[in-house]
C-alpha cells in the first residue's frame, strides 16, 4: 500500500513540474517572420523573447506571454494594431518611454506584433 501511495505521489508531483514556469515559444517560432524580424531589429538586446535566437536581454521587460497582457508599457491597451504602432513608434504613444525608435517599418511591426501576440 505504501509503495502505491509513493508511486501516486511521485506521478502527481512529476505532473506538476510542467505547470507554471515561463511561457514557451509557439511551435512555429522558427518559421515566424515576426520572430526573425525581432532578431533582425535586435529586440533581444533589451528584451527576453521566447523563440527568438539570443533574445535574453534583461534591460527591459520580458516579452514572454505578451499575448496575455492587458497593457503595453502599463498604459496602452494591448491590441494587435496598438502593439504594432508601439513597435514602430513607441514615443507616439508614450512620449516619455525609454524604448527607442528602432526604425521598424509598419509591415515589419505588424509581423513582430503578430508573433508577440501569439506568446501566451
Predicted regions span which residues?
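Generic structural signal for secondary-structure transition and capping sites
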Residues: 43, 71, 91-95
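C-terminal motif of bacterial Sec signal peptides marking the signal peptidase cleavage site
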Residues: 15-18
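Gly/Gly-Pro-rich "capping" loops immediately C-terminal to redox-active cysteine motifs
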Residues: 31, 35-37, 48-84
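Electrostatic cytochrome c docking/interface patches
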Residues: 20-39
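Axial heme c-ligation environment in periplasmic c-type cytochrome domains
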Residues: 57-66, 86-119
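The canonical Cys-X-X-Cys-His
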Residues: 34, 40-50, 99, 112
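Bacterial N-terminal signal peptides that target proteins for export
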Residues: 1-7
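Inter-heme linker and motif-flanking segments adjacent to c-type heme-binding CXXCH motifs
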Residues: 22-27, 52-54, 72-73, 118-120
